Each structure stands twice: as structure tokens, then as C-alpha cells.
């Protein structure tokens, strides 16, 4: 997965353009907290950031792109603790619980990004891969040296499925973290 993701989200931007994107994302974060995911628009974010709508759409061509960029920013700023635990099962469970807590703490972002990542917006394709690569890397790190790629992929698929169920309201993100404990233990049985 990571081989498909080679360029950072702001590759090719000069310092001023990167600063504009950062202002837009900071404004989007504030706007999301105040109005929620349903009411958030690229235009309202542009207004809050003090840039024209045309400028905002240059960097964030769609609402889905905005949510995906916000979520990737959230993942990168999250700074998870180093995976701790006596064994790979405990370390992966710590990773899934941390991610679930992070989503539970940002329900509006979780709601917006769920729809964005499930959509067919081509502007989100690269970000979808980068987000998935972030999950894969966290699982790989928790498993340690020599992690079986099939196990890593299975964990990523299980986590994605749990995200989908939580995003559909079938469980809370907190419940997702709890339920993934059993899933992780089952997947890793015999592989650690």
C-alpha cells in the first residue's frame, strides 16, 4: 500500500501556498467544531480563513477532499504513544483502542470523513491511500520486526470494517475499540 503513496499532500506548493492550505485547514477545524459536519462547506471555511472561495477550491476542490485532508492532519497530529504491551496482541489492541478513542473524541470529524472516504470523489483517492497507509504502518510497528504482510492486511481490513460499522451507527467508536480487542486476538492467534 505504501508504495502507491509517494507524495505528501502539499507537494509542489511554495511556502505561501502551503501557508494558505494550513490556514484553510485550521479554519476548517474551527468551523467543524462550531457548525458540525453537515453544515460545513468549503465556502464557509474560506470565509473563516479570510480567503476567497476560488482560492479555497483551488486547494480543497470538494467537501470530501476537505474532510479527508482534515482527517489525515488529525492522524498526523495525533502522536500515538509507542505501542506497549507484553506481546503483539496487546500492542495491536493498544493501537486500535487509541485510534478508536481519537475518533470518539472527534465525532464530527469521524462523521464527515466516513462519508468522504466511502464516496467516489477522485480528489480523495490519494488521501484514502495515505490514511490506509497510516493505519497499516501503525499495525506493522505494533507487530514488530518480521510482521507477516497477510496479518497486517487482515488487521487493516478488520479495522476498516469496524470503522464502517461505527460510521453507520451500529456501534460507538468506544465500543469499536472494545470489540476490536477480540478481533485482534482472534487474528493474531497462532501468528505471534
Where would I find each of the regions flagged by the language model?
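Hydrophobic alpha-helical connector segments
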Residues: 69, 80-108, 155
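C-terminal peripheral helix-coil segments that are non-catalytic and often amphipathic
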Residues: 1-7, 101, 137-145, 168-192
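Amphipathic alpha-helical packing segments from all-alpha helical-bundle domains
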Residues: 120-157, 175-185
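Short secondary-structure transition hinges
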Residues: 101-143, 164, 168-169
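Helix-turn-helix
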Residues: 23, 27, 31-65, 69
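Amphipathic alpha-helical interaction segments
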Residues: 23, 44, 65, 94, ...
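N-terminal intrinsically disordered/low-complexity leader segments
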Residues: 1-19, 30, 192
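Short, basic, alpha-helical segments at the C-terminal edge of helix-turn-helix-like DNA-binding modules
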Residues: 72-78
Amino acid at each position: 500500500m505504501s508504495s502507491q503513496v509517494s507524495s505528501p499532500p502539499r507537494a509542489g506548493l511554495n511556502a505561501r501556498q502551503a501557508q494558505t492550505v494550513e490556514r484553510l485547514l485550521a479554519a476548517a477545524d474551527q468551523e467543524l467544531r462550531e457548525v458540525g459536519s453537515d453544515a460545513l462547506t468549503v465556502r464557509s471555511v474560506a470565509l473563516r480563513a479570510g480567503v476567497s472561495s476560488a482560492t479555497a477550491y483551488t486547494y480543497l476542490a470538494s467537501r470530501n477532499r476537505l474532510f479527508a485532508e482534515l482527517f489525515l492532519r488529525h492522524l498526523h497530529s495525533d502522536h500515538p504513544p509507542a505501542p506497549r504491551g507484553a506481546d503483539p496482541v496487546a500492542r495491536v489492541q493498544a493501537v486500535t483502542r487509541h485510534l478508536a478513542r481519537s475518533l470518539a473524541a472527534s465525532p464530527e470529524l469521524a462523521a464527515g470523513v466516513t462519508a468522504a472516504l466511502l464516496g467516489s470523489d477522485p480528489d480523495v483517492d490519494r488521501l484514502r491511500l495515505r490514511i490506509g497507509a497510516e493505519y497499516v504502518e501503525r499495525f506493522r510497528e505494533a507487530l514488530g520486526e518480521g510482521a507477516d504482510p497477510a496479518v497486517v492486511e487482515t488487521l487493516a481490513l478488520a479495522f476498516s470494517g469496524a470503522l464502517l460499522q461505527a460510521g453507520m451507527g451500529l456501534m460507538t467508536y468506544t465500543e469499536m475499540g472494545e470489540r476490536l480487542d477480540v478481533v485482534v486476538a482472534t487474528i493474531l492467534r497462532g501468528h505471534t
